[in-house]
Each structure stands twice: as structure tokens, then as C-alpha cells.
């Protein structure tokens, strides 16, 4: 079974699909070895590793290179966060062909304007393109793919932008009708209430995907009760790495020797075993 088939079958199964965020090939391998179903090649995390904001600054090629390295390293599927699709429908077509040919199993595009800002940025820019414009991108993605199991995830930002539940549901329906394989409904609330409201109101037939960065106390069992099929832990690995490296360096700069902090590090053998 191909990685693409594997991801689709898991999404159609009874268990919630767990996706771990990564920012390079090594972190992707760690996601894989920890038992996750797939890897999320997140634009926020990849941008941060370049010391850049998540604001459409890196090019498609720069994001692609990271996701491609993950794909060549891992046996589990890679889901690439492709922001707004790097342009219009023609850009989306080119992107889909390139990502699919690299063995990446899925792309996720969102209905924001370009250049985007991270959805969780306080007082950030959260303007959306029209429903019609985003439908054109989905149609282009669907037409460009060769493998029907290469998944197109449409990310709905209407709740983030303050346009409300009805607009979110209307857009999600249009995106399903255009050919998307799943709907990622995004929220920056600290509780999952509006996500649950969306899921309970959703009349579509394609799966719902969530990213519980802000409502992080939500239980997997509760997500399943609301028929949510995929959870993406988008940035936790990056945040843990940032904290651990910062802590270690602050200790090391004042250390007489480093034997006292070796328990905080992986061994050389751990890295050889990658």
C-alpha cells in the first residue's frame, strides 16, 4: 500500500488520525518513530527554523525542499502546509505536481489573502479571499494531481477572521463541492466549543481536521464524539526544541564542565541510530 493510500484509508477508518508536526527531516523521523500516523510539515515551524515569521516570506521552493527531505526520510505520509497555495490557480497546479512527484501525500491550502500572517498572531491580518477564488484553487489542485489518493485539504479561516459560523459552513460546503478531500476548520479560541459547533452542524461527507494549538485541553475522545477525524499537533515539537536548546545554552555558557548537563542531551548513539 502506498503512503497516499495509507493516509486515505486511515482517514476513512474509525480511529482519529494523529499527525505530528515537524520542521526538518530529523524531527519528522522522530514523529515517525513515536508512532504517529503522519507528519505535518508546518509553515510556521519551517519559517521559524529560518528565523523568519510565518508571513509568506519563504518561497514555495524553500518549503518544498524541507517537505521533500521529510518524504525521502520517512515511511509514513507527509502532509505539507502550503499556506495560500503560493499564488493563484496556476501556481497551485504547479505546486501540486511538484509535491506529488516528490512522494508527499497531501497538501493543505487556506483561504486567506496573500501574503498571509499566522492565524494565532495577536492583532494579525486575517483577511480572506472570496469563496469563488478559493474554489478555483481547489479545482486547479484536483485537476493537477495524478493520484486520487493524493489528498487536498481545504483550510477554512472564517472563524479566525470573525466572519462567523454560517460563513465557515458555507465555505466548507463549497470547498467540498469543488473536490477537496477534507476540511480543516481553524480556531484560536481557548475552548473547543466553536469547533464542536462546526462539526455538529456540518452536513458534508468529507472528514474534519483540527489543530488544537489554543484549545489544547481538548480530549481525543471528545473530538471523536463530534466525528472529527484528524488531529494535527502542528508546532509542539518546535516549541519544545526551542525551550530545551535555550535552557541548555544558558546552563552551558556558565558551566565549568558539561558533564553535569549530559543527562539533558541525547547521546551520540541516539543520533547514530536515526
At which residue positions do the language-model features occur?
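N-terminal charge/polar-biased segments
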Residues: 1-14, 262-274
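Extended, intrinsically disordered, low-complexity segments
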Residues: 143, 236-274
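Alpha/beta enzyme core
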Residues: 2-232, 240-247
Amino acid at each position: 500500500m502506498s503512503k497516499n493510500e495509507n493516509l486515505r484509508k486511515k482517514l476513512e477508518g474509525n480511529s482519529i488520525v494523529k499527525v505530528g508536526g515537524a520542521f526538518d527531516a530529523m524531527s519528522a523521523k522522530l514523529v515517525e518513530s513515536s508512532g504517529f500516523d503522519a507528519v505535518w510539515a508546518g509553515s510556521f515551524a519551517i519559517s521559524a527554523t529560518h528565523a523568519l515569521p510565518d508571513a509568506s516570506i519563504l518561497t514555495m521552493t524553500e518549503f518544498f525542499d524541507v517537505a521533500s527531505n521529510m518524504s525521502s526520510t520517512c515511511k509514513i505520509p507527509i502532509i505539507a502546509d502550503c499556506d495560500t497555495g503560493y499564488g493563484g490557480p496556476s501556481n497551485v497546479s504547479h505546486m501540486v505536481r511538484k509535491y506529488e512527484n516528490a512522494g508527499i501525500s497531501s497538501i493543505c491550502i487556506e483561504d486567506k489573502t496573500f501574503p498571509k500572517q499566522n492565524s494565532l498572531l495577536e492583532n494579525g491580518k486575517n483577511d480572506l479571499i472570496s469563496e469563488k477564488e478559493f474554489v478555483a484553487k481547489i479545482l486547479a489542485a484536483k485537476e493537477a494531481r495524478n493520484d486520487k489518493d493524493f489528498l487536498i485539504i481545504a483550510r477554512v479561516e472564517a472563524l479566525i477572521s470573525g466572519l462567523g459560523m454560517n460563513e465557515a459552513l458555507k465555505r466548507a460546503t463549497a470547498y467540498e463541492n469543488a473536490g477537496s478531500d477534507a476540511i480543516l476548520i481553524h480556531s484560536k479560541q481557548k475552548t473547543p466549543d466553536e469547533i464542536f459547533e462546526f462539526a455538529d452542524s456540518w452536513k458534508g461527507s468529507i472528514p474534519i481536521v483540527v489543530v488544537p494549538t489554543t484549545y489544547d485541553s481538548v480530549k481525543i475522545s471528545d473530538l471523536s464524539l463530534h466525528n472529527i477525524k484528524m488531529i494535527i499537533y502542528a508546532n509542539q515539537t518546535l516549541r519544545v526544541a526551542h525551550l530545551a536548546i535555550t535552557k541548555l545554552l544558558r546552563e552551558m555558557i556558565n558551566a565549568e564542565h558539561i558533564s553535569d548537563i549530559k543527562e539533558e542531551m541525547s547521546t551520540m548513539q541516539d543520533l547514530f541510530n536515526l
